[in-house]
Amino acid sequence: EVVNQWHDANVTSPAYRASTKRYFENSKRIPHGSILSVKDGKISHFDHLFKKYAEEIGWDWRLLASLAFTESNFDTTAVSWAGAKGLMQLMPRTARAMGVPEGKEQNPEESVKVAAKYLKLTSRSFSKIEDPNERIKFVLAAYNGGMGHVFDAMALAEKYGKNKYVWDNNVADFILLKSKEEYFNDPVCRNGYFRGIET
């Protein structure tokens, strides 16, 4: 009851409206501009980095480039609403844990190198997904939204009779449902609310 009273007293305040927009309405993506020239085989000024580090993890370099485009629009100075920085939008804590010195998150090579390392580690967390193309979908979702939310969606998929090792029409459906209270409060979920529409 106390929460309801607080809500009723604050629902029209500027701070409440700003929080609602930040967490529930605004897109968290950085607006996209143009890329260089796909027909000429040039996606960005960082193609050499994508090629180098994608090879180390066994990915097509264009997939790594598309992840960077989605995350930062190839802007090395980008900083997200949540504090993620640089070309690959590394969270500072993740960057530190992966060996990036403080202040170097926006260095393109550091960013791509650490992102590739993180993607490789994340892929190991989904090793039970045997099809490598299917596993990549889970890895990309975890990169964007966090492994915990993907694990929650997998648990929900299993609970509701879907295949927890298949993304399309299975786990992807439950990543979206994690924005609904009955799902994010389900006992199989450990990581709470997740909007999911950008994952």
Question: What is each model feature region?
Answer:
Residues 60-66, 85, 133-141:
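Alpha-helical scaffolds flanking conserved acidic
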Residues 1-28, 41-44:
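Extended ligand-binding regions for polar small-molecule ligands
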Residues 26-73, 112, 126-130:
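Export/targeting segments at the very N-terminus of extracytoplasmic proteins
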Residues 77-103, 110-121:
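Substrate-binding/active-site groove segments that recognize
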Residues 134-199:
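Catalytic and substrate-binding regions of cell-wall glycan-acting enzymes that process beta-1,4-linked
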